Amino acid sequence: MVPEQNDLTESSVWLQLENLAREEGSLHLSDFFVQELGRCAHFCLESDGLLVDLSKQRVSSHARDLLVSLADERGLDRWSEALFAGAEVNCTENRSAKHWLLRDPSDQAAEIHGQLEIMDSIVSRVLEGQWRGVLGDAITDVVNVGVGGSELGPLMAAFALHSTPLAEGEVRPSLHFASSMDGSQISQVLQELNPRTTLVLVSSKSFTTVDTLHNANTARSWMARALGLEMDNEAMLRCHFIGISAQPDKMTAWGIPSTNQLQFWDWVGGRYSLWSAIGLPIALTVGMHGFRELLAGAHDMDLHFRQRPWHENIPVMLALVDVWNINFLDIRARAVLPYDGRLKYLPAYLEQLEMESNGKSVSRNGDPVDYHTCPVIWGEVGPNAQHAFFQLLHQGTQPVACEFLMTARRYTESAHSGAAVELEGQHALSNANCLAQSRLLAFGEQALDSTLALPAYKRYRGNQPSTTLVLDELSPRTLGSLLAMYEHKVFAQAVIWGINPFDQWGVEMGKVIATDMLAVLADPDGAHEVDDSSLSLARHIACKQATQ
């Protein structure tokens, strides 16, 4: 059973937080540092390989204590117990959310470990050159065909961990990703590949996703024509296609033999699926040892979330500070700013994880909420962001909370020895910029410690709150811990807001309407019950296509 919750905005702690926000809302971040000596020590949290500095958030010690009380009042401890007990915390689909079980090393996950062993066999054969194409060639390229969680997580993690050393004798293939339904990505990827040495991963929880199946069909047709084979050739499908899904019957119907099928379960949400067989592209990048380290890091954070008191609990404190910003300071946007180029795809991954989970306006009880929930999440690699939208952060009119990510150690591998000094200098430059931007956003021109009077157009007001996360180094284990941290943060926020973070009904109706719009595009002059704007656009497209 899941705990019941009362009306959030009528709680006594919520009302106290509203009063405190009115009292402290006009304070500048610099005031907090003056009023609370040793503030950084009180607002820094650590876990294995990760430090989180919340001191540049516009939250006082009093506000923090009240927020912790809010977590207690909302029953976060009972909700956490329900999550890890396998209760049906996904109330609209009557499902549990046991993605945490995918990284549990205990015997209760025997079925999961069985799939990991199948993954291990596939990964070893590919990396050691033993997986052969239908004409006997070793695999050099792997194409991941998937969309949403079947791409965002694997793409992000594989890119981040690409420099992870492999075992002796292992050679990682080149990875490619195709998700767009218009065919542009799959077309560009395939025209650069040799079908004799290409392996295609078809990743779809339902194995009915239109985007994925159209791309998979295109890849199968390309492979068959290039090799002079029929599209249902069993040897071609056995040597060049692997399916990953919760629906084995549908994989079989498409043509993927059972020996090439990896499975996961309906209680694994797409945005939580990189820990499952959906993470095969990650394993092909770091090897199975590296993939197991990724799982171990996530399990470390699971234990941290379950065992640490709230005021020492990284996911919970991140969630509570976000709630403070959104609901009490009216800051409804957050920029994710990694100052390590390997985390290039982390902002896009978090956009899905957070906005698809908590972008809800209806409570678990089915009532409209009367408070804000998930903020708009966006971001870019820090140095690029400085030349793109930092102008708005520093001198614009929108309050934005920022999240900086950096690594303490980099370029220690022997592979970089030829340019170690230069690369270490670049790493220091990146970290210096990260620290400088967080200081400037917090304190404005006061950070310059200068008495010069500046004209208005050169002024920096500061007072933009930020969190800084420092990884000891970027490794499979620390990345696993970081990603699980964000998952638990999202869950904790959902508990505070009383919403279901494990469904995504907001993406479903558009798929139905798209089917209707296909008929409109095919015959825009026919009789259709559709709005004038959409009909006019369909006719415009038809007109342009008729003249090409």
Swiss-Prot record:
EC number(s) stated in the UniProt entry for this protein: 5.3.1.9
Pfam families, alphabetized: PGI (PF00342)
Protein name: Glucose-6-phosphate isomerase
Similarity remark: Belongs to the GPI family.
GO biological process, one term: glycolytic process
Organism: Alcanivorax borkumensis (strain ATCC 700651 / DSM 11573 / NCIMB 13689 / SK2)
Coiled-coil segments: none
Pathway named in the protein's UniProt entry: Carbohydrate biosynthesis; gluconeogenesis; Carbohydrate degradation; glycolysis; D-glyceraldehyde 3-phosphate and glycerone phosphate from D-glucose: step 2/4
One term under GO cellular component: cytosol
Reaction it catalyzes: alpha-D-glucose 6-phosphate = beta-D-fructose 6-phosphate
CDD domains xref list: SIS_PGI_1, SIS_PGI_2
Functional description taken from the UniProt entry: Catalyzes the reversible isomerization of glucose-6-phosphate to fructose-6-phosphate.
Gene Ontology MF term list: carbohydrate derivative binding; glucose-6-phosphate isomerase activity; monosaccharide binding
Active-site residues, Swiss-Prot/TrEMBL: E356, H387, K511
PANTHER family xrefs: GLUCOSE-6-PHOSPHATE ISOMERASE
Cellular compartment(s): Cytoplasm
Presence of keyword Cytoplasm: yes
Keywords associated with the record: Cytoplasm, Gluconeogenesis, Glycolysis, Isomerase
